[in-house]
Amino acid sequence: MSSPDGGYASDDQFHGNCSVPIMMGQYEWTDPLTMFQDAKTKKEAGSANSRGKAEARIRRPMNAFMVWAKDERKRLAQQNPDLHNAELSKMLGKSWKSLTLASKRPFVKEAERLRVQHIQDYPDYKYRPRRKKQVKREEEGFLPSADIPGPQVMGCNAMVGQNYKMQYSGQNSQQSQITPAGYFEDHNPVGFYYRGYNVPKYYMSQNSSGYCSPPTQGEYQALSYNFNSSYIPYQQNASAPAMGKQMAVKENIIQESPEHGIMGCQVSPQMYNGQMYVPECAKTHPVAQTEQHSSLHQSQQMVTQNYLPSQQDGHLESDIDKTEFDQYLMYEPKSDTELIYTIDQDSGAYSTNLLPSLISEANSVCYYDYCGV
């Protein structure tokens, strides 16, 4: 016989000791409505705090224009609902400027009354404008770009000044100090064109481990073709009998024409790294020294004016080593007097036929080294 409840009561009694109701009773259930109400109250509290902060800020008293524009703006906004607020402000400014002083007087009086009232209400008020946050811009310094190699990459040009100073400091105690490492990188026009090419390291300096670019034609002219003096004893010992006759002729030539030289330069007074170069003939003849003293002083001034136009050029010439560029030449180095004058054994005349060959050979060295041949 079936029960009136369809057997649900018996099932509830049978499952009365089920663990599910016991487990569910251990947790605290929260109503979703209460959660929503709590969030709403927090939001209202935050808005109240912000409103309190806004109300705490004391507004400035209105001036005459603000008093007049307070009602005039509303009227223009009703007449022109499509206009932007900025356009309304422009129209208000133009119309205020067009008003006469008599029409502005009531608004000026009202603004003065508001100012006095504001002072009475807020005696400690001080106008503090809200400054706009300015983004601190970092100072753009001179940073080395990725295209320009640093002193570590351009090892030769960075160490050229130091090598010049170290090799020639014993001969000249009054030289300038060592130039900075990046000086030749900024003033060497050849290194700029070499930086994009993989030039083979054919020419290596004896005192530096980096690649040295060959000098240009202007640098050869700045050297005045003065080479290492260490080769002179070897040449004198090797060809002493032949040199005896030539030196006598050379001394006569120099005495007869002391101001004749190649490329318009004086032969007897030559400047090498800030020093006066006096030929051997002037040293061997004491009488000639007193006669040539005045001419040496005048020629030194001429050389300084013509070939040392600025202190920077003189600084460059003082850093040039006379022995650095021997490795780029394909012929036997000679002394200064031999380079200046080539003696003809038969006629006894002198010529400067060696100069064009030197210039052409220097240009060929620079060209082939630049092309990487």
From Swiss-Prot:
DNA-binding region: 58-126
InterPro entries to which the protein is assigned, alphabetical: HMG_box_dom, HMG_box_dom_sf, Sox_C, SRY-related_HMG-box_TF-like
Predominant location: nucleus
GO MF terms, alphabetically ordered: DNA binding
All residue ranges annotated as the Sox C-terminal domain in the record: 256-373
GO cellular component, one term: nucleus
GO biological process: gastrulation; Wnt signaling pathway
Places the protein is found: Nucleus
Pfam families, per database record: HMG_box (PF00505)
Region annotation Required for transcriptional activity and interaction with ctnnb1: where it falls in the sequence: 324-328
Location of the motif 9aaTAD: 323-331
Subunit annotation: Interacts (via C-terminus) with ctnnb1/beta-catenin (via Armadillo repeats); this interaction is required for inhibition of wnt-signaling.
Record remark: domains: The 9aaTAD motif is a transactivation domain present in a large number of yeast and animal transcription factors.
Function: Transcription activator. Doesn't appear to bind to the consensus 5'-AACAAT-3' DNA binding site, but binds 5'-ATTGTT-3'. All of the sox17 proteins are required for embryonic endoderm development and gastrulation movements, and show some redundancy in function. In addition, the sox17 proteins have distinct but overlapping roles in later gut development. Acts downstream of vegt-signaling in endoderm differentiation to induce a range of endodermal genes both directly and indirectly. Also represses wnt-responsive genes to inhibit wnt/beta-catenin-mediated signaling.
UniProt name for this protein: Transcription factor Sox-17-beta.2
Organism: Xenopus tropicalis (Western clawed frog)
Taxonomic lineage from the root: Eukaryota, Metazoa, Chordata, Craniata, Vertebrata
Originating gene: sox17b.2
